[in-house]
Amino acid sequence: RDVLGSRGLGDVYKRQHLRECGIFLIIKKHPLQSGWSLNEGAYTNIRYVTEEMLQKSGIQLYELVGLMDGLISDYSSIAVDYMLLDRPLGYVLTDLESYRSTRGFVFEHPEEYMPGEKIYNLEDLKDYFSHIAVGEDPFKEERRRLLPAMHTMPKKSGYCEALAEYLNIK
């Protein structure tokens, strides 16, 4: 499962490829995750952040997300929100079956609602980074197709009126 964590040769491989692609990777682990090294000085192009670090800096997670060229997630709702930015998404699915059997999904076939690269191993991760580095976005059309199913899109004008109507205050 630990495609993004630091584990021996895979970590060396990942760091080298990130440098070759000119990518700076920020990894924010879930509060319930453990076992990742937060050795900030060990990497030149990877930083691990926690919710506590963001709070101490006065930064909201979504402020950081808005600056990102791409997002790698698993089954988190942040990926659904990130679709609104129309930027590349990658999904780490190394524990898909165990997640399905223990926690379950809202959708019967969740992969159909993941408009981005499916990452099962380091090679898939390398492909995702390579696409980001050269500006390729192979899932752009899939995101656009899924966007209306995942988000109620506002009108081009009349936002306030639509909101008032929705809230029954008009």
Task: List PLM regions with ranges.
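Catalytic binding pocket for nucleotide-activated donors in carbohydrate/polymer assembly enzymes
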Residues: A42-T44, S77-H151
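Short acidic active-site motifs
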Residues: I59-Q60, D124
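Single conserved hydrophobic/aromatic residue that forms the stacking wall/gate
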Residues: D2-Y13
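Short, acidic/turn-prone active-site loops that include or flank metal/cofactor-
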Residues: E51-K56, T94-S98
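Catalytic donor nucleotide-activated moiety binding site of glycosyltransferases and closely related
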Residues: K14-Q55
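C-terminal alpha-helical cap of glycosyltransferases
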Residues: K155-K170
